[in-house]
């Protein structure tokens, strides 16, 4: 059975044409992207690395990593977001290879081929996150790193990521997230270790609605990222 939620794909297909509009529903992704790329680059030194971006969508992260000197492949199951990504790279001149394929299928085709794998804001949109994590382990080279980001599952995350972001501040369309699919750091850590990945670091991402700025810090109550390593 394919690890794809067609309803989730449809949500992002409908919004795909606005992916690179910095004032659209994707404004938060554009604003947090530099913070996340810097954090990843500081730990993985992207220049010259072969990188896979799982759940690349319209290519915001993929292009940013390519601009840091990485050779990037972006994969997604959404046809419209991939079309937007391919069109945007014609405008930007940034080279990324985009493919419509699941992580699990690519792991069969390209085991141990990537120095770095990123999987950001994707795990909470698939039926079986642990399956994606196992696929990421299989695709990263021994000694390589895998980065995940998702949203914690607790009352504060429900209040801020759903009620606040979708209903009050209207930063995201209603229904973007399903609270039941949010993932606690303990769960993400356990799935990573079960797959063979060693958790090296965790960082939180917070938003101040007064200043309208994001920052990375130790608060992992809502949005967070983890760095994992496949040992040699």
UniProtKB/Swiss-Prot annotation:
GO molecular function list: 2-polyprenyl-6-hydroxyphenol methylase activity; 3-demethylubiquinol 3-O-methyltransferase activity; polyprenyldihydroxybenzoate methyltransferase activity
Function: O-methyltransferase that catalyzes the 2 O-methylation steps in the ubiquinone biosynthetic pathway.
Top-level lineage group: Bacteria
Reaction(s) the record says it catalyses: a 3-demethylubiquinol + S-adenosyl-L-methionine = a ubiquinol + S-adenosyl-L-homocysteine + H(+); a 3-(all-trans-polyprenyl)benzene-1,2-diol + S-adenosyl-L-methionine = a 2-methoxy-6-(all-trans-polyprenyl)phenol + S-adenosyl-L-homocysteine + H(+)
Alphabetical GO biological process terms: methylation
CDD domains linked: AdoMet_MTases (cd02440)
Pathway(s) it belongs to: Cofactor biosynthesis; ubiquinone biosynthesis
EC numbers, comma separated: 2.1.1.222, 2.1.1.64
Leading EC class: transferase
Binding site for S-adenosyl-L-methionine: 36, 55, 76, 120
The protein's name in its UniProt record: Ubiquinone biosynthesis O-methyltransferase
Family annotation (InterPro entries): SAM-dependent_MTases_sf (IPR029063), UbiG_MeTrfase (IPR010233)
Similarity-based family: Belongs to the methyltransferase superfamily. UbiG/COQ3 family.
Keyword annotations from UniProtKB, A to Z: Methyltransferase, S-adenosyl-L-methionine, Transferase, Ubiquinone biosynthesis
Pfam families with a match to the protein in the record: Methyltransf_23
């Amino acid at each position: 059975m394919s690890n794809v939620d067609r309803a989730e794909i449809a949500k992002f297909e409908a919004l795909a044409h606005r992916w690179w509009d910095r004032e659209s529903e994707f404004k938060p992704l554009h604003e947090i992207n530099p913070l996340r790329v810097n954090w990843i680059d500081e730990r993985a030194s992207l220049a010259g690395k072969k990188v896979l971006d799982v759940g690349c969508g319209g290519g915001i992260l993929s292009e940013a990593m390519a601009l840091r000197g990485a050779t990037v492949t972006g994969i997604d199951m959404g046809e419209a977001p991939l079309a937007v990504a391919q069109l945007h790279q014609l405008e930007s001149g940034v080279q990324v290879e985009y493919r419509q394929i699941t992580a699990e299928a690519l792991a069969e085709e390209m085991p141990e081929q990537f120095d770095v794998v990123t999987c950001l804001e994707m795990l909470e949109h698939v039926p079986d996150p642990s399956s994606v994590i196992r696929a990421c382990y299989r695709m990263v080279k021994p000694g390589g790193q895998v980065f995940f980001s998702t949203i914690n599952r607790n009352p504060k995350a429900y209040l801020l990521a759903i009620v606040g972001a979708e209903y009050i501040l209207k930063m995201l369309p209603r229904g973007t997230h399903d609270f039941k699919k949010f993932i606690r750091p303990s769960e993400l850590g356990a799935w990573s270790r079960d797959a063979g990945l060693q958790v090296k670091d965790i960082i939180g991402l917070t938003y101040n609605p007064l200043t309208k700025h994001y920052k990375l810090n130790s608060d992992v109550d809502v949005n967070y990222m983890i760095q994992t390593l496949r040992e040699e």
